[in-house]
């Protein structure tokens, strides 16, 4: 696997980009998560960033990438509506792992947004998408630009939802390389990694939450529910950051 030209790949249509990365992805599928991170740092351009929602299994990718690339900027898009336990988890992991945390927020405060638009998350798919654009997508785009990112690591896994089931290890999104080192991990592998390194799940895991986002669009898992039904009232799985 040789170095890849981001500018040249960005000029290709999306289908052609996928084809151009196919051989590299076939090789990356054979590597461990740690080897994928090391390969990316050697063969893909900097600056490098890692995004995290500080969700249920967030400690895995934060620990894995940060131990190989200490001080990598960790991007959090803060909506202002996270659970108190999430903010506490952020503080705990930032201190424990010595994270270089970079917090990005919408230009409008949560209160101002509600005054202007009402409660967007109660306005169906269109409202949820507008909410996500304001609070997730725009802040992430700004983060990637300000941090001059060319390679973006994230902790997505295929097992998490149907929308993630066929994601490759390496892709191009928002004009930068996107690397998913633990994309093929199952829940058992996540658990074993956490145990091995003395790490914890998000505090709400013990209360029956399989996925954690904002207070108003996250539900506890109940028997018969798919994991994606615990977010956005089952209308959407993705918050917008990992789409497009």
From Swiss-Prot:
Reaction equation(s) it catalyzes: [thioredoxin]-disulfide + sulfite + adenosine 3',5'-bisphosphate + 2 H(+) = [thioredoxin]-dithiol + 3'-phosphoadenylyl sulfate
Chief subcellular location: cytoplasm
Active-site feature positions: 239
GO molecular function: phosphoadenylyl-sulfate reductase (thioredoxin) activity
Keyword Oxidoreductase: yes
Entry EC no(s): 1.8.4.8
Subcellular localization(s) per the UniProt record: Cytoplasm
GO CC terms: cytoplasm
GO biological process terms held by the UniProt record: hydrogen sulfide biosynthetic process; sulfate assimilation, phosphoadenylyl sulfate reduction by phosphoadenylyl-sulfate reductase (thioredoxin)
The keyword Transferase belongs to this UniProt entry's keyword annotation: no
Annotated pathway: Sulfur metabolism; hydrogen sulfide biosynthesis; sulfite from sulfate: step 3/3
NCBIfam families named among the record's database cross-references: cysH (TIGR00434), PAPS_reductase (TIGR02057), PRK02090.1 (NF002537)
PANTHER family: PHOSPHOADENOSINE PHOSPHOSULFATE REDUCTASE (PTHR46509:SF1)
Family stated for the protein in its record: Belongs to the PAPS reductase family. CysH subfamily.
Protein name: Phosphoadenosine 5'-phosphosulfate reductase
The encoding gene: cysH
